[in-house]
Amino acid sequence: MFSRIAAVSFLALPLLAAATPVLRRGDCNTGPIQCCQSTETAGSAAGSALLGLLGVVVQSVDVVLGLNCSPISVIGVGSGSACDASPVCCENNSVGGIISIGCVPIQL
């Protein structure tokens, strides 16, 4: 009986490993890769002041904001046009080009 359980477990292990998603470096599942000059949390002095000036309300003070962001092409990541500041993936890049909301830092 034990040998059957061991055999089934051993044969099922590769199925579990194959079903696990793996994100590659530079992948974004929240939005396009952006290069931001700086990042702040919504609860920081700079973040809350900027959100107040723009009249933007966010759900949490822990939301990461990208400031002065520009898009990075995936093709350019390895060829010298990489981001020297803060590479991030952001959910909402439509706040006038000044601020991006819901950013997640990534490694290029």
From Swiss-Prot:
Q: Which SMART domains does UniProt cross-reference here?
A: HYDRO
The record's tissue-specificity note reads: Highky expressed in hyphae cultured in liquid medium.
Q: Which domain of life is it from?
A: Eukaryota
Query: What use does biotechnology make of this protein?
Result: HgfII displays a better dispersion and emulsion stability in an aqueous solution with soybean oil than hgfI, which is of great significance in terms of expanding practical applications of class I hydrophobins.
Family recorded in the similarity comment: Belongs to the fungal hydrophobin family.
Q: Name one Pfam family in it.
A: Hydrophobin
Q: What does this protein do?
A: Aerial growth, conidiation, and dispersal of filamentous fungi in the environment rely upon a capability of their secreting small amphipathic proteins called hydrophobins (HPBs) with low sequence identity. Class I can self-assemble into an outermost layer of rodlet bundles on aerial cell surfaces, conferring cellular hydrophobicity that supports fungal growth, development and dispersal; whereas Class II form highly ordered films at water-air interfaces through intermolecular interactions but contribute nothing to the rodlet structure.
Q: Which residues are glycosylated?
A: 92
Q: Which GO molecular-function terms appear in the entry? A: structural constituent of cell wall
Q: Keywords for this entry?
A: Cell wall, Disulfide bond, Glycoprotein, Secreted, Signal
Subunit-structure text: Self-assembles to form functional amyloid fibrils called rodlets with a diameter of 15-30 nm. Self-assembly into fibrillar rodlets occurs spontaneously at hydrophobic:hydrophilic interfaces and the rodlets further associate laterally to form amphipathic monolayers.
Protein name as catalogued: Class I hydrophobin hgfII
The UniProt entry, under InterPro entries, shows: Hydrophobin
Q: Which cysteines are joined by disulfide bonds?
A: 28-89, 35-83, 36-69, 90-103
Q: Which residues form the signal peptide?
A: 1-19
Main location, first listed in the record: secreted
